[in-house]
């Protein structure tokens, strides 16, 4: 059973041209996760891991029908980046970003909640439906489909399970 992501989820990687975003995109594509593109301002038209890169989230959603985002952008840009994600109509945002001030996290969560976007993070390990979609920092080789799911507040502790 999948709750947050599955084989029908259309995922964008925000910050796809950065080192972390590129590594996630390559791993997700190789694992069969339904990634449809990425967003990095000023890099529209490029390809990363065979995926199209767009300049804005609205442009990416219009072109791909994406409904989920894995955000791998620098902490200094995360508030504006999340607002762009929410305003583009994304249903789920996974914020794989550390060192976000508490007040920024509170603002982002309130903004997203008021507009119907679910957030995992900041500092989230992500979301996985084994064998269907993996938008997390968890290795597919260690995951199996089944009846049991795990939710963790701590990405680091999730690795121990």
Residue ranges and their predicted role:
Residues 1-161:
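Catalytic-core regions of core metabolic enzymes
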């Amino acid at each position: 059973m999948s709750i947050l992501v599955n084989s029908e989820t259309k995922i964008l990687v925000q910050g796809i041209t950065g080192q972390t975003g590129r590594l996630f995109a390559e791993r997700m594509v190789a694992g069969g996760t339904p990634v449809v593109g990425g967003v990095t301002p000023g890099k529209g038209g490029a390809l990363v891991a065979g995926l199209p890169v767009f300049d804005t989230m609205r442009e990416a959603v219009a072109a791909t029908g994406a409904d989920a985002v894995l955000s791998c952008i620098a902490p200094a840009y995360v508030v504006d980046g999340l607002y762009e994600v929410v305003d583009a109509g994304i249903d789920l945002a996974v914020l794989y970003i550390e060192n976000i001030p508490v007040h920024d996290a509170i603002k982002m969560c309130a903004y997203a909640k008021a507009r119907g976007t679910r957030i995992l993070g900041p500092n989230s390990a992500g979301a996985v439906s084994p064998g269907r979609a993996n938008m997390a920092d968890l290795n597919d080789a260690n995951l199996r489909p089944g009846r049991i799911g795990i939710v963790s507040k701590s990405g680091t502790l999730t690795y121990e399970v």
